[in-house]
Amino acid sequence: MSKKSVLITSLMLFSMFFGAGNLIFPPMLGLSAGTNYLPAILGFLATSVLLPVLAIIAVVLSGENVKDMASRGGKIFGLVFPIAAYLSIGAFYALPRTGAVSYSTAVGVDNALYSGLFNFVFFAVALALSWNPNGIADKLGKWLTPALLTLIVVLVVLSVAKLDGTPGEPSSAYAQQPAGAGLLEGYMTMDAIAALAFGIVVISAFKYQKVNKVRTATVVSAFIAGILLALVYLGLGSIGQVVNGEFADGTAILNYAALSTMGQAGRIMFVAILILACMTTAVGLISATSEFFNSLLPGVKYHVWATVFALISFGVATMGLDTVLAVAAPVISFIYPSAITLVFLSLIEPLLFRLKWTYLFGIWTAVVWALFMSIPALNPFIEWAPLHSMSLGWVVPVLVASAIGLAIDWNKKGAQSVAKKESISV
């Protein structure tokens, strides 16, 4: 297992995770949490870093892609879930969002023609960079990610050194339950779904590099990428700790920090950071979705899928960020409970045994609960659940359902063991 290959692939994975949302969430958390920053950021890291890392490991333990994982939930779930996951974080949401966010920050003019031209160039470059799936690790890991990290480090160091703001009183939820608020904020990045998708890219990269222990290398890369994410989040969060005033979001905080410390050059650097973050994520998403659908329908080549997804993303992004969010956010919210359930069941399975009924009970409870959460008219039927107000009402029902399934699996295993012993004695 080459250390160089692992490092380059780790940098690639970091850059694919680190999109626009990952850039702007931590500074706002740093500002809002105030003096309660430490528990808030630790909660944030638990769901925005640890959960995606565990998702990558779950993919490795289950096979080579999310379809191998999802098959444990039955044939229907095994087909529908991965398709929904790849489309929602791909061409119908996260992918066009990379272009829309880049345009709104870099240009910010409400003009359909300008938006169309910008997004055309953006997705043309992303398509070109993802055209050869075997070369993505080098393009992202060797060049784009080091450039992105360098710019982020410069912004963080100058901001912390030059800005003289002090942490204020924690606002809203951060005053009462800072760790819980941070946990929920990290949960809302929904990076666990992206992790399920990116697993196939990491595994393919190591296979192309002829790495012997692909599974081990993938797990190590996931941990290294996670450590990098955590360090960057801590740095960005610290910027929120040294600014004072009212800011609409993390973008405004970072823009202020860049202008205050470096003037107009800082503004240019911030735009470069955001576009690089969005571009590396776009390349990863095009590659991941195209590889998955190529494996699903081998008759349609990777390059055809890549072109189709880039064109769809261009069209959706040109319609604007609000359109992207309105269309895809409900879908993401619907499949996320199932994704997390799938990840944790895949992680505990090697410690126990084949969990047929545990998977079926747990996953389908998550699906049904998410359906009730997605339809406002059905919400009154589930408001009694613990954590419902935090959009986590599905957690306890899924745990109970999984425990029932585990009891059935355990009972069946015991019955099979008895039957086997009796047949041997006869």
Swiss-Prot record:
Membrane topology (UniProt): Multi-pass membrane protein
GO function terms (MF aspect): L-isoleucine transmembrane transporter activity; L-leucine transmembrane transporter activity; L-valine transmembrane transporter activity
UniProt keyword terms in alphabetical order: Amino-acid transport, Cell membrane, Membrane, Transmembrane, Transmembrane helix, Transport
Outcome of gene disruption: Deletion mutant shows a considerably lower isoleucine uptake rate as compared to the wild-type strain.
Alphabetized InterPro entries for the sequence: Brnchd-chn_aa_trnsp_Livcs
GO biological process, one term: L-leucine transport
Residues spanning the membrane: 11-31, 41-61, 76-96, 111-131, 140-160, 186-206, 219-239, 268-288, 296-316, 324-344, 358-378, 390-410
Keyword Hydrolase listed: no
Domain of life: Bacteria
Primary site of residence: membrane
Record localization: Cell membrane
Repeat recorded as keyword: no
Any one cellular-component term (Gene Ontology): plasma membrane
Its job: Branched chain amino acid transport system, which transports isoleucine.
PANTHER family: BRANCHED-CHAIN AMINO ACID PERMEASE BRNQ, BRANCHED-CHAIN AMINO ACID TRANSPORT SYSTEM 2 CARRIER PROTEIN
Family: Belongs to the branched chain amino acid transporter family.
Name of the protein in question: Branched-chain amino acid permease BrnQ
Source taxonomy: Bacteria, Bacillati, Actinomycetota, Actinomycetes, Mycobacteriales
Gene: brnQ
